[in-house]
Amino acid sequence: MRRNFSRALAGLCVGTLALGLGTAPTAAKEKITYGYLIDPALEGVLYAIKQGIVKSDRIEIVGKALAIPALIQSTPTKRFDVLMNAVMAIPLAAKRGLKLVVLSSALRAGKGGLGAGIWVKKDSPYKTMADLRGRTIGNYALRSTGTTWIRLALLKKYKLNVSYKNGDMNWVQIPAPALLTALETGRVDAATLIHSQAYKARGSGNYRVLAWTNRDIREIYGVDTVAAVNVTYPEKLAARPEAFKEFNRMLYESVQYAVNNPDEVGAAIAKDGKISAAYFKAWMEDYSYFPGAVSDADLKAMETIWAGAVEMGILKSAPKAADVVWKHAVRE
């Protein structure tokens, strides 16, 4: 009896083990959380990932679009594995003891150089940047890297005092969606617009530009501006290096899909983004570009804006760009 019970128990165990092996679920993918700027163009960059065109057997990218203040607030909390962040955030975070590691460049000036313009109304009396002395400029984020690049161009090319205190112009921060209205109603004399607004303003014929500062920076320093990068934290990299390599691969391939299929991607984001289908292609070519990689020129651009920030009194010192870029970053 005891022998038969033992045999039955052994058989039951073997049967259970075999059943378990036969029905074991596929191992769950590692999750990489990614916080990025809320913008229709960024949805285009991530289109191939979200549509399952670019896949991975190893990781799942969980993305969340955030406004600039939320991105800034998320940096010290380490809420996200990867965060789209300002180039200026790297030395500023280091000053507070927080080290950030660059995985790739996220916003690089488009070859057309149409970003970072100083806009005025078509019938405005202002003809040159010198005419804006004593006038008010509306801006979407005074402390952003994009604005720091603009100020550097105005300082170097137009010899303007760009200090926020007692400078040549009065700078006013206004929520981005309200900038064109502020310009139209005369609340401000000039404005720096976000890319989607600049695209609409240029197409309307109701506004003109006194300075394309991205072009000015290229002329002065020989680099395309880099305003944002994708960053993570050293301890996260150390814990899961292969997962972050896979993240970089997927992001880069998603960018390449968007580059090769701009009409498809543009039409898709136009449905939800309330923007023209042609905007995405124009954004990549003329306004900004999301490399998903790092070039030597990007490193030079980072060091250029940090040196400019030191000159303008924003920073006391600046790091070497090569020291903050991950050794496994995708390189151009």
Summary of predicted features, one role per range:
Residues L237-I314:
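Secondary-structure end/capping motifs
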Residues E303-E332:
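Conserved C-terminal helix/tail region of periplasmic/extracytoplasmic solute-binding proteins
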Residues G22-A28:
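Sec/Tat signal peptide C-region and signal peptidase I cleavage site
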